[in-house]
A protein has these predicted regions:
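ATP/NTP phosphate-donor binding region
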Residues: 1-84, 310
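C-terminal charged capping/lid subdomain of soluble metabolic enzymes
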Residues: 2, 18, 290-362
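Short glycine/serine/threonine-rich phosphate/pyrophosphate-binding segments
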Residues: 16, 40-44, 70, 95-102, ...
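Generic secondary-structure signature for well-ordered alpha-helical cores
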Residues: 24, 52, 56, 135, ...
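A short, small-residue-rich loop immediately preceding and capping a beta-strand
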Residues: 80-103, 107-118
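A glycine/threonine-rich phosphate-anchoring loop and its flanking beta-alpha core
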Residues: 105-198
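Active-site segments that bind and position negatively charged phosphate/pyrophosphate groups
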Residues: 188-299
C-alpha cells in the first residue's frame, strides 16, 4: 500500500488571508510560530493581522536558532507552547523549516510553512536535512509533508538576494538529478509521476531566473519572482515527495553527493547550499558525459553569478580525493542510482567540470 500526500499552497501578497480558513480545516485554535529572527520580523505582522479577530490563539513566536541541529530541534520539542499547539507555523529558509518539521515528528503536530526566502524546496517536502553542531551533515529525517504552504512573493522579494540566487542554484539540480537517477527505467506509478513533474523544473529557471534575481536585488515583487518561487518551492518540492519513498530513492544524485561531501572539507568562506549544488550539477553532467547540458547549465551559472569552478566555492583539485572519500557517506552514494558510483568516475567528473568552468572565466 502507498499513500501520497501533497501540500496545499497559497501564493500571493495577500496569502495570509487564507490562514484562518486553512487552520479551520484542521480544527486548529492554538498555534506556535517558529522561525529565524529575520523571517519572523518579515512574516509575523502579516500572520498576526490575518488571525486578529479569529478564535485562533498564538501561544508563542520563537526564534529557533541558526541551523537545523539536534540541539535546536530539541528546543522546539521541549517548548510547552509547541507541545500545546494544534499547528506549528514554520517561517524562514530551509534550516528553520527543517528544524520545525523534524521536531513535529516527535510532537506529532501538523506543520504549516511560510518560506520567507526561496533558497530550496523544504517548505513542501517530507524530508529534512539535519546538521551536526560543526555544520557538517548528520543526515536526513523523514517528517510528514507540510499541510499548507503560504508563499508571499513580496516577503521573498524583500529578503536578502543571495538566498533567491542560491535557491535557483539548488533548483537547477532537481530535473537532471531525477532524470539521471531514474534512467534505468522500470518505474512504478509514483516515481514515474515524479519524473514527469521533474521535467518541468529547469525551464522556468532559465526563463525567469535572471529577471527574478534583478527584481529581488531591487526588492521588487514581480511575476518573475513569483514564478521562480513557485518553481523552487512547489515544482521541486512535489518532485521530492514523489521520488523519495520507503522502497526507492531518486530524489538526488551526483550533484548532492558533491555538495554533501564539501560540507566536510574545512575551508575559508561561507557557501550557501544551492550555490555549491549548482556546481555539483556541472559535475553531474560531466559524470554522465552530457556535454550539451554541461555547456548550457554552465553558461547559465555564469550569467547568474553562480560558480563554475572549484575555486569559487573555496576548493581546489587537491581536495578531490577527500571529496571522493566523504561522498561515500552520503545517501546519494549509498543509493547508487541508476548504478553504483565510482571514485574514479566521480573524481574525473569533478576535474572535467572544473576545467570547463575555467574556460568560461578565461
Amino acid at each position: 500500500m502507498r499513500t501520497i500526500g501533497m501540500s496545499d499552497y497559497t501564493v500571493g501578497e495577500d496569502c495570509f488571508t487564507e490562514l484562518p480558513g486553512a487552520l479551520a480545516e484542521y480544527g486548529a485554535t492554538k498555534v506556535a510560530i517558529i522561525g529565524g529572527k529575520r523571517a519572523l520580523a518579515a512574516a509575523l505582522p502579516g500572520i498576526e493581522a490575518a488571525l486578529e479577530g479569529t478564535d485562533v490563539e498564538v501561544l508563542e513566536a520563537r526564534v529557533y536558532g541558526t541551523n537545523s541541529t539536534r540541539a535546536n530541534i530539541a528546543k522546539v520539542v521541549n517548548s510547552p507552547a509547541c507541545r500545546e499547539a494544534d499547528v506549528l507555523i514554520a517561517c524562514g529558509g530551509g534550516k528553520a523549516l527543517d528544524t520545525v518539521k523534524t521536531a513535529a515528528i516527535e510532537l506529532k503536530k501538523i506543520v504549516f510553512t511560510v518560506p520567507t526566502i526561496c533558497s530550496n524546496c523544504s517548505a513542501a517536502t517530507a524530508i529534512a536535512v539535519v546538521y551536526n553542531d560543526d555544520g557538517s551533515l548528520e543526515g536526513y529525517s523523514y517528517p510528514n509533508r507540510p499541510a499548507h504552504i503560504f508563499i508571499n512573493p513580496k516577503i521573498i522579494a524583500e529578503a536578502p538576494a543571495e538566498y533567491f540566487w542560491a535557491g535557483v542554484g539548488d533548483a537547477l539540480s532537481k530535473q537532471p538529478e531525477v532524470e539521471y537517477a531514474t534512467s534505468a527505467g522500470n518505474l512504478e506509478h509514483t516515481a514515474g509521476l515524479g519524473l514527469a513533474l521533474a521535467h518541468t523544473c529547469s525551464e522556468p529557471l532559465f526563463t525567469y531566473g535572471v529577471q527574478g534575481l534583478e527584481d529581488v536585488r531591487q526588492n521588487l515583487s514581480s511575476e518573475a519572482v513569483k514564478q521562480i518561487a513557485l518553481d523552487i518551492v512547489v515544482n521541486t518540492g512535489y518532485v521530492s515527495n514523489l521520488t523519495n519513498q520507503n522502497d526507492y530513492y531518486y530524489n538526488s544524485s551526483v550533484a548532492h553527493a558533491f555538495y554533501n561531501a564539501t560540507c566536510s572539507i574545512p575551508r575559508k568562506g561561507t557557501y550557501l547550499h544551492g550555490e555549491v549544488v549548482s556546481l555539483g550539477v556541472l559535475v553531474l553532467f560531466a559524470y554522465t558525459g552530457d556535454t550539451e547540458n554541461l555547456e548550457r547549465y554552465a553558461a547559465f551559472n555564469k550569467q547568474m553569478g553562480l560558480p563554475v569552478t572549484l575555486e569559487q566555492v573555496g576548493l581546489s583539485e587537491a581536495d578531490i580525493p577527500a571529496l571522493c572519500e566523504y561522498a561515500h557517506a552520503t545517501n546519494e552514494w549509498k543509493q547508487g542510482n541508476p548504478e553504483s558510483f565510482t571514485d574514479e568516475k566521480f573524481a574525473a567528473a569533478i576535474k572535467a567540470a572544473n576545467a570547463y568552468g575555467h574556460t568560461l572565466l578565461a
